[in-house]
Amino acid sequence: MAPDCVGPEVEALAKTLQPGEVLMLENTRFHAGEEKNDPELAKQMASLADVYVNDAFGSAHRAHASTEGIARFLPAVSGFLMEQELEYLGRAVANPEHPYIAILGGAKISDKILVVETLLAKCDKLIIGGGMANTFLAAKGLNMQDSLVEEASLETAKAIMANSGDKLVLPVDAVIADKFEAEANSQVVAVEEIPAGWRMLDVGPKTLELYKRELSGAKLIVWNGPVGVFEMPKFAEGTFALAKLLAESGATTVIGGGDSASAVKKAGVAKQMTHVSTGGGASLEFLEGKELPGVAALNDK
């Protein structure tokens, strides 16, 4: 283990390496120039090697000295994991098989407006769950009571629904709670019937039946974001049941990183998925159609 990632001592250690040996460098973010994509820092790191291999897809959306800058000074290629990420996520962006079903969850629509619009242009159905579904349901005129609703995104949600035809699939029932706590009282109600003082924390059984029907016959399923507060056992059933539906679907299944990857692992079905991405923000930006700096810098993509 080197004491730093650049400098005379690191250079000396690099020169002593024998074939088959590995020198692990210190965290590049200990240098302020890393996140600033400082060309001098990138050049110093490049001086330690003959070839740069980027296998960190999860950092590919960041233009840092160790992801984008260094590639200006060395032959730069992708590693096997990076290659796999680009292959499977690339299918969803460039040449998806149909029927193509996309699933988006998570808390906020504001974080995923661009990916919603991009997916609607390519997929056959877009299933919306999680906290972001509350905003769509509120935009339809439903009283979501104490559920998380992004008031500032209501008009955006209305516009998306107006332009989506019959592609958008929203929850029809919900597991609700009287407080946002693991031990809260809970019950299942239709999304139109949430009582005052309660909030939606998971999708209900009728919604899961709807998901099952929509996923039937799919050739490609891309999932990013849980459909409930799966960190709390009482409100994890929807997310885990959805993971199992994907595992049994027979489709090519691509799981976005972050919470979705954690969910399929906790559900015990990660090995039954075609591809579980290691990139949270990176996979989302890739699905939005953005060019990732760490990928664009490579000689082979």
Question: What are these model-predicted stretches?
Answer:
Residues 1-301:
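Active-site loop-to-helix "anion-binding N-cap" substructures in soluble metabolic enzymes
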